[in-house]
């Protein structure tokens, strides 16, 4: 007897409806019709069954802190960093844990199966590190949480950041992070990349660097990151997050830069909701969109995955843990409007991001863990168009979130009409 069978589900490959049988936490059969009894049967009725959404870039130590101690009035990255500096001394480890656990509940209900969260390493108490290591343990049965040691104030600029970043890694943080564009000078930014990549190489860790989150076309730290990746043999293990300055760079320089990134197999993590909000703040009109060159980077063969970055924190007042909101924004800002492009945007919040964070055994295939989300949509494009309702979230063959389909009832002169938004 199976533990769970999903009947008549459409998979992301668009090849038609199938049944999926789960037993002992694994997918044991995928067929047009699965025969045999099951403890529970779910009728998908042609809805899309997707692998879990993956968020490759988030700040869980800051999430849901909106308004403490004040709001970001200018809406800029730099005021957000300043505001975060005011907030850090006011929060306790328990505060961070409580907010993070609430966010994890939101994320799971929205079908997120894994989050890579940066955690600030510039306070001697390492409050965020202590808190999120505890959260990682608490949520491990239903959410994969990968942590990045992130020296928010600059690993060189802040006198204790290097020591504390190493302490965080010793405590069990997974990935080496950095922020070269926030160092005092371009040369110190380059030095910080060299230093942090060497630490990652020595420890056998991945790197995820906030890089060139600026409108300044001369912010070119991604070039140094690509060089150090190649020099240290870190190909495929390094991600450049944001890369917003590429939006403003000279096309000739970009034509030289992208092949260097390809040679180093750099992963790319734009954060569309935040990039479109924070960038271009010094512009009048025309006003820059700020999102990096997604199409060109993808077409060059680089792995591109979209992150959500922030939800209700010093940098962003909105958000609801919805990776389809992220894909929806990326599609518009990047003018990714062909059917192939729109379907790829769905991949950028699922399988591409899973590859970036090196998530093992991901996908809906026989023998893999039974991790998936059932969406109230027929295919990937409709899922993005509707930011589709999550009907079911399954982790290791166990239903961990369930909700009823959304329907609308209209009362018209000729009578009552019940419908949903599916095409």
Spell out what each predicted region is:
Residues 64-96, 172-175, 221-239, 262-267, ...:
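Active-site gating loops and adjacent loop-to-helix segments of metal-dependent hydrolytic enzymes
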Residues 206, 227-238, 274-278, 288-375:
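His/Asp/Glu-enriched, well-ordered alpha-helical/loop segment
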Residues 127-141, 158-267, 283-306, 362:
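Histidine/acidic residue-rich metal-binding segments in metalloenzymes
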Residues 355, 366-422:
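C-terminal cap of metal-dependent C-N hydrolases
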Residues 1-36, 380:
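N-terminal metal-binding scaffold of metallo-dependent hydrolase/deaminase domains
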């Amino acid at each position: 007897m199976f533990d769970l069978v999903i009947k008549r589900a459409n998979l992301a490959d668009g090849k038609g409806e199938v049944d999926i049988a789960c037993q002992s936490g694994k997918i044991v059969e995928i067929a047009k019709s699965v025969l045999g009894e099951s403890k529970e049967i779910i009728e998908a009725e042609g809805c899309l069954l997707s692998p879990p959404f993956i968020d490759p870039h988030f700040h869980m130590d800051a999430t849901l802190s909106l308004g403490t101690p004040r709001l970001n009035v200018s809406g800029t990255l730099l005021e957000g960093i300043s505001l975060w500096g005011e907030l850090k001394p006011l929060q306790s480890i328990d505060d961070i844990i409580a907010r993070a656990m609430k966010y994890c509940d939101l994320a799971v209900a929205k079908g997120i199966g894994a989050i890579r969260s940066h955690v600030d390493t510039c306070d001697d108490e390492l409050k965020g590190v202590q808190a999120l290591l505890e959260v990682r343990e608490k949520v491990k049965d239903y959410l994969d949480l990968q942590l990045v040691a992130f020296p928010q104030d600059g690993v060189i600029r802040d006198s204790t950041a290097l020591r504390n970043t190493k302490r965080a890694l010793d405590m069990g943080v997974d990935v080496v992070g950095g922020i070269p564009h926030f160092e005092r000078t371009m040369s110190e930014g380059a030095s910080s990349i060299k230093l942090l990549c060497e630490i990652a190489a020595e420890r056998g860790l991945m790197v995820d660097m906030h890089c060139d989150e600026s409108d300044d076309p001369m912010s070119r730290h991604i070039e140094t990151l690509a060089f150090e990746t190649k020099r240290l043999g870190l190909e495929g293990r390094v991600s450049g997050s944001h890369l917003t300055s590429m939006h403003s760079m000279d096309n000739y320089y970009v034509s030289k830069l992208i092949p260097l990134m390809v040679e180093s197999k750099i992963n790319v993590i734009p954060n569309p909701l935040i990039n479109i909000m924070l960038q271009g703040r010094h512009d009048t009109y025309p006003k820059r969109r700020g999102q990096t060159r997604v199409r060109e980077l993808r077409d060059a063969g680089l792995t591109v995955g979209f992150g959500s970055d922030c939800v209700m924190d010093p940098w962003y007042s909105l958000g609801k843990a919805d990776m389809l909101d992220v894909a929806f924004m990326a599609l518009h800002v990047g003018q990714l409007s062909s059917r192939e492009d729109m379907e790829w945007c769905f991949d950028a919040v699922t399988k591409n991001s899973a590859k970036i964070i090196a998530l093992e055994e991901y996908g809906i295939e026989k023998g893999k863990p039974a991790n998936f989300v059932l969406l109230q949509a027929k295919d990937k494009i409709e899922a993005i168009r509707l930011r589709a309702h999550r009907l079911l979230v399954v982790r290791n063959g166990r239903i961990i979130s369930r909700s009823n389909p959304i329907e609308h009832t209209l009362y018209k002169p000729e009578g009552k009409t019940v419908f949903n938004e599916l095409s």
